[in-house]
Amino acid sequence: MRSIASKKLVIATHNTGKLHEITTLVAPFGLEIQSAKELDLPEPKETGVTFEENAYIKAFAAAKNTGLPALSDDSGLEVDALGGAPGVYTADWALQSDGTRNFSKAMQKIEDELQKIGAHEKSQRKARFISVICIAWSDAYADYFRGSVEGTFIWPPRGDKGFGFDPIFLPDGYENTFGEMSTEQKHGWKLNDKTPLSHRARAFKLLAENLLTLS
């Protein structure tokens, strides 16, 4: 694995919610952060069929354009009763004809699909969030870190915190959805200490323990 020697890192996302979460996770490590949106970098087409492939596409595009190491997250929701859908295509389920994303409609779409197959009980709605974080360099080298969290797709949505599908995801062992949790509840962790709750924080913890040092 390759360390981030320059202490400079590009966050390869134009998603405001995701950028906020990643920036919060990176903060203790004293890195100079810039986002793809700030740098006005183009958004590459996510043509991969795995989370790893799409994470690499985004990270390498930013690294190639800037000459700096770039971090990208590709994440999604897998619902067992739907054969793992929406999975790697999670963001596409929210895509509208004008190019924007409407996650309220996407959550409703999942609920409609579950109703169609008669998946009404909590036991029939097992789901998980998956996050793959990729750090890529301009020479095409990359490291990958995967995190996941098991839970249940619940309806109706609850909470207005977080972003995306957070209001419909109830993690196992908890009474609050991700949409009802504070940032600390969802992402809090310490190096070489407890396992964080969220999929993204779990992936980032692996990255930090392998590539980063506290500032």
Swiss-Prot record:
Keyword Cell membrane: no
Domain of life according to the entry: Bacteria
Active site, renumbered: D74 (proton acceptor)
E.C. number: 3.6.1.66
Biological process annotations from GO: nucleotide metabolic process; purine nucleoside triphosphate catabolic process
Quaternary structure and interacting proteins, as annotated: Homodimer.
Free-text function comment from the UniProt entry: Pyrophosphatase that catalyzes the hydrolysis of nucleoside triphosphates to their monophosphate derivatives, with a high preference for the non-canonical purine nucleotides XTP (xanthosine triphosphate), dITP (deoxyinosine triphosphate) and ITP. Seems to function as a house-cleaning enzyme that removes non-canonical purine nucleotides from the nucleotide pool, thus preventing their incorporation into DNA/RNA and avoiding chromosomal lesions.
Protein name: dITP/XTP pyrophosphatase
Organism: Bartonella quintana (strain Toulouse)
Lineage, uppermost ranks: Bacteria, Pseudomonadati, Pseudomonadota, Alphaproteobacteria, Hyphomicrobiales
